[in-house]
Amino acid sequence: VFEAGIRDGIIKEADSAYFQVFSVAGMKGTLAFNCPRILSDKELSPDSIQDVSFAVIEGREQIWRLYNFVKRYFPGFEEAYISNIADMPGVRESSRFEGEYVYSKEDMTASKTFENPVLHASYPIDIHSYKKDTSTLEKAVNDYYLPVESLKSAQFKNLYFAGRNLSATFEAQAALRIQTSCFSMGEAVAKDILRRQK
């Protein structure tokens, strides 16, 4: 189907690089699209105004092409409409803090255990590339655990962090940046602060 859309000029080849759709619980007839992926000649930086502006413009153009594509090529989408577009592009990886412990891919694949684990997960190492056909999805061998020390600053006593900015290597962060893990990190930070106040 994508080849037909490209051939007919409805979408560009880059638009087909990543296409992911989810149903939305409790909202019959509604789908959430987790696309497009912004491809570039260089790695984009979330700290660069020019790169973010490029990603916003390119992303919106791709969204409208994909919208016209699904309406034309997917039965049942003839009356579809876009109800919302994110204000900013999703950034998977940016700056990370240095914590009391830097969590690594080796910790993950060895299922290393810790005295104060904040989450127990099994999401794979999911690396999205700015180049076409170079992304990887590397399954962890076993479940893995993250220590609270990866959420506590090595330099400042009262500084915690939760989410994609945790203290981890690039590969480990690629598995831990998902929403459910981030929720667990936020909860763990609150619990650790309360535990220390007792």
Regions found by a protein language model. Name each.
Residues 1-161, 166-172:
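Mobile, glycine/GP-rich and aromatic-enriched active-site lid/loop segments adjacent to catalytic centers
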Residues 175-177:
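Short glycine-enriched, charge-decorated loop/helix-capping segments at active-site entrances
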Residues 183-197:
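Internal hydrophobic alpha-helix adjacent to the cofactor/substrate pocket in enzyme cavities
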